[in-house]
Amino acid sequence: MKSKPIAVFTTAGSLEDARKLATTLVEQKLAACAQISEIESFYTWDKEVQNDQEFRIMFKTTKDKYKDVEKAILKIHSYDLPAIYAVNVDELYKPYDDWVNESIK
C-alpha cells in the first residue's frame, strides 16, 4: 500500500544551502522533488524582531519518509533551530502521486 503524500518545508539562509538540501534529499530518494523559492521572513529571536531574506524549500515526499527527511535536514542544516514541518496532501493527481511514490523507492 502506498504511503500518503506530504509536503515538507524548511528554510535556508542562502541559495547555496537551499540547493545543497534539495539536491541531497532528492539524491537520497527521500524526496521525489524539491522546489526553492526566495522569501522574506519576519520572526522573533533573542526577544527582538528579525527580518531576513531566506529560501524556502518544499520537498514532495510521503508520510512514511518524514522522520528520515527530518534527520537528513538536521544533519546538514546551518541553523541552530530550523523550521521543519509537514503538510498533508489530501488530494493529488493520481499519476503524479504514483510518480512521487516510485521516485522515492
Label each PLM-derived region with a short phrase:
Residues 1-105:
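Positively charged, small/polar-rich N-terminal and surface patches that mediate targeting and assembly
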